[in-house]
């Protein structure tokens, strides 16, 4: 079962959500990831994946994997900010790689 860690960027995004129903759904999705069930996900590029949450404006969580035991949540957003969020997540993933 993978361990899930978050970046400060992800924590700020998640903390800023006002829709409590969305927060519950997103947290439930993260809990399922910890059980090894990723659900609706697709690879983006450079080891960054997009997890889609079908609620409200179409929430997205961007993450990377380190082996099979570690998931790092890089950033979040919704369909309206998807392009910028992907670029931000890729930058976060690169910074993590550089710190290795």
Give residue ranges: language-model regions.
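Helix-centric, low-specificity signal for extended rod-like, repetitive segments
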Residues: 16-18, 22, 45, 53
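A short, surface-exposed loop/turn module that caps and links secondary-structure elements
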Residues: 28-55
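A residue-level signal for beta-strand positions that form part of recognition/binding surfaces
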Residues: 1-3, 48
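PIN/NYN-family metal-dependent endoribonuclease catalytic core
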Residues: 7
């Amino acid at each position: 079962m993978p361990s899930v860690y978050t970046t400060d960027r992800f924590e700020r995004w998640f903390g800023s959500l006002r829709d409590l129903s969305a927060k519950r759904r997103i947290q439930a999705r993260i809990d399922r990831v910890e059980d090894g069930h990723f659900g609706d996900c697709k690879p983006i590029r450079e080891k960054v994946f997009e997890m889609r949450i079908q609620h409200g404006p179409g929430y997205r969580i961007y993450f990377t994997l380190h082996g099979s035991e570690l998931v790092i949540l890089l950033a979040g957003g919704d369909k309206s900010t998807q392009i910028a969020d992907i670029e931000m997540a890729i930058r976060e993933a690169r910074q993590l790689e550089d710190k290795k």
